[in-house]
Amino acid sequence: MASAGGDECEGAAPEADRPHQRPFLIGVSGGTASGKSTVCEKIMGLLGQNEVEQRQRKVVILSQDRFYKVLTAEQKAKALKGQYNFDHPDAFDNDLMHRTLKNIVEGKTVEVPTYDFVTHSSQEIRDMFHLRLFVDTDSDVRLSRRVLRDVRRGRDLEQILTQYTTFVKPAFEEFCLPTKKYADVIIPRGVDNMVAINLIVQHIQDILNGDICKWHRGGSNGRSYKRTFSEPGDHPGMLTSGKRSHLESSSRPH
């Protein structure tokens, strides 16, 4: 996600007198079908951005899915059989992703590619995010969501499960789960955790209002703490199967 941020910490200046606002990047990660997109959409809704015309929005969602490499004819044939590994980092055009994020941070206009899931037409990136979130959802719940979603896409159940055990689960454990230590915020239960969602929304609202002093005081790149958000009834300080985030190696639904 990206929102319009600012650079001043000396008190609120009239909007017309403020310097040009720089985008504030938030990386959202998690396992396949953990609810990453749902969390982002919920945040957008609470910020009132879904009712705003696309070009007038102050907060936008940029999906890593858009940066899949274009498949060759041979790779497309494998993909149709569920034999292509969409979860490996090499499946993404990381150079294009890095250039796009860099241009966004610099306030430049960018063109984002669109990936078609029917035709299948690094640290460097991780460090570009000012805030990193990880959406934590139980693995059984994620698998059931993925199965239901892919069946709706016309996929065969046996193919779905084979792809999950062959590619998705191993890639999550090798590439996504190890990024746990880099997350600033963990969101247990995803979109159901409104304590976390509301607090993140408030932070974004502060940034949109130009009140970002707290981010600058907290340390480099706007990160001042690592935290797992719990709701009433949760054991204080307890991480329930916590996982952490960054866009570069997240295990996205395919």
Swiss-Prot record:
<dbReference type="GO" id="GO:0044211">
    <property type="term" value="P:CTP salvage"/>
</dbReference>
<keyword id="KW-0067">ATP-binding</keyword>
<dbReference type="GO" id="GO:0005524">
    <property type="term" value="F:ATP binding"/>
</dbReference>
<feature type="modified residue" description="Phosphoserine">
    <location>
        <position position="230"/>
    </location>
</feature>
<comment type="pathway">
    <text>Pyrimidine metabolism; CTP biosynthesis via salvage pathway; CTP from cytidine: step 1/3.</text>
</comment>
<feature type="compositionally biased region" description="Basic and acidic residues">
    <location>
        <begin position="245"/>
        <end position="254"/>
    </location>
</feature>
<feature type="binding site">
    <location>
        <position position="155"/>
    </location>
    <ligand>
        <name>substrate</name>
    </ligand>
</feature>
<feature type="binding site">
    <location>
        <position position="120"/>
    </location>
    <ligand>
        <name>substrate</name>
    </ligand>
</feature>
<dbReference type="InterPro" id="IPR006083">
    <property type="entry name" value="PRK/URK"/>
</dbReference>
<feature type="modified residue" description="Phosphothreonine">
    <location>
        <position position="228"/>
    </location>
</feature>
<comment type="function">
    <text>Phosphorylates uridine and cytidine to uridine monophosphate and cytidine monophosphate. Does not phosphorylate deoxyribonucleosides or purine ribonucleosides. Can use ATP or GTP as a phosphate donor.</text>
</comment>
<comment type="pathway">
    <text>Pyrimidine metabolism; UMP biosynthesis via salvage pathway; UMP from uridine: step 1/1.</text>
</comment>
<feature type="binding site">
    <location>
        <position position="115"/>
    </location>
    <ligand>
        <name>substrate</name>
    </ligand>
</feature>
<keyword id="KW-0808">Transferase</keyword>
<dbReference type="GO" id="GO:0004849">
    <property type="term" value="F:uridine kinase activity"/>
</dbReference>
<feature type="binding site">
    <location>
        <begin position="30"/>
        <end position="38"/>
    </location>
    <ligand>
        <name>ATP</name>
    </ligand>
</feature>
<dbReference type="InterPro" id="IPR000764">
    <property type="entry name" value="Uridine_kinase-like"/>
</dbReference>
<dbReference type="Pfam" id="PF00485">
    <property type="entry name" value="PRK"/>
</dbReference>
<dbReference type="GO" id="GO:0043771">
    <property type="term" value="F:cytidine kinase activity"/>
</dbReference>
<feature type="region of interest" description="Disordered">
    <location>
        <begin position="224"/>
        <end position="254"/>
    </location>
</feature>
<dbReference type="InterPro" id="IPR027417">
    <property type="entry name" value="P-loop_NTPase"/>
</dbReference>
<keyword id="KW-0547">Nucleotide-binding</keyword>
<comment type="similarity">
    <text>Belongs to the uridine kinase family.</text>
</comment>
<feature type="binding site">
    <location>
        <position position="146"/>
    </location>
    <ligand>
        <name>substrate</name>
    </ligand>
</feature>
<keyword id="KW-0597">Phosphoprotein</keyword>
<feature type="binding site">
    <location>
        <position position="87"/>
    </location>
    <ligand>
        <name>substrate</name>
    </ligand>
</feature>
<feature type="binding site">
    <location>
        <position position="163"/>
    </location>
    <ligand>
        <name>substrate</name>
    </ligand>
</feature>
<protein>
    <recommendedName>
        <fullName>Uridine-cytidine kinase 1</fullName>
        <ecNumber>2.7.1.48</ecNumber>
    </recommendedName>
</protein>
<feature type="binding site">
    <location>
        <position position="192"/>
    </location>
    <ligand>
        <name>ATP</name>
    </ligand>
</feature>
<dbReference type="GO" id="GO:0044206">
    <property type="term" value="P:UMP salvage"/>
</dbReference>
<feature type="region of interest" description="Disordered">
    <location>
        <begin position="1"/>
        <end position="29"/>
    </location>
</feature>
<keyword id="KW-0418">Kinase</keyword>
